[in-house]
Amino acid sequence: MLELNKRKEEAKVAKEQKVKAIVRTYYVIEGNKVKLKNKKCPRCGSIMAHHLKPNERWSCGKCGYTEFIGASKKR
């Protein structure tokens, strides 16, 4: 019983310590307009991540949609 309570407390502490994304890094202010730095996912509408390695691509962490940039060098 004590072990179960200990696990619950550890899970609660881990949940509280999660790092949230800093939303202000996704936008750029140009004059009086606010622009999004990254692309939006065409499937679900969330902000996509730009990856450079191993292949340059845009990927959505929410739905898994991926756009590859350029031709693949592997054959």
Curated annotation (Swiss-Prot):
<comment type="similarity">
    <text>Belongs to the eukaryotic ribosomal protein eS31 family.</text>
</comment>
<keyword id="KW-0479">Metal-binding</keyword>
<feature type="zinc finger region" description="C4-type">
    <location>
        <begin position="41"/>
        <end position="63"/>
    </location>
</feature>
<feature type="binding site">
    <location>
        <position position="41"/>
    </location>
    <ligand>
        <name>Zn(2+)</name>
    </ligand>
</feature>
<keyword id="KW-0862">Zinc</keyword>
<dbReference type="GO" id="GO:0003735">
    <property type="term" value="F:structural constituent of ribosome"/>
</dbReference>
<keyword id="KW-0863">Zinc-finger</keyword>
<dbReference type="GO" id="GO:0005840">
    <property type="term" value="C:ribosome"/>
</dbReference>
<dbReference type="GO" id="GO:0006412">
    <property type="term" value="P:translation"/>
</dbReference>
<dbReference type="GO" id="GO:0008270">
    <property type="term" value="F:zinc ion binding"/>
</dbReference>
<feature type="binding site">
    <location>
        <position position="63"/>
    </location>
    <ligand>
        <name>Zn(2+)</name>
    </ligand>
</feature>
<feature type="binding site">
    <location>
        <position position="44"/>
    </location>
    <ligand>
        <name>Zn(2+)</name>
    </ligand>
</feature>
<dbReference type="InterPro" id="IPR011332">
    <property type="entry name" value="Ribosomal_zn-bd"/>
</dbReference>
<keyword id="KW-0689">Ribosomal protein</keyword>
<protein>
    <recommendedName>
        <fullName>Small ribosomal subunit protein eS31</fullName>
    </recommendedName>
</protein>
<feature type="binding site">
    <location>
        <position position="60"/>
    </location>
    <ligand>
        <name>Zn(2+)</name>
    </ligand>
</feature>
<dbReference type="Pfam" id="PF01599">
    <property type="entry name" value="Ribosomal_S27"/>
</dbReference>
<dbReference type="InterPro" id="IPR022845">
    <property type="entry name" value="Ribosomal_eS31_arc"/>
</dbReference>
<dbReference type="InterPro" id="IPR002906">
    <property type="entry name" value="Ribosomal_eS31"/>
</dbReference>
<comment type="subunit">
    <text>Part of the 30S ribosomal subunit.</text>
</comment>
<dbReference type="GO" id="GO:1990904">
    <property type="term" value="C:ribonucleoprotein complex"/>
</dbReference>
<keyword id="KW-0687">Ribonucleoprotein</keyword>
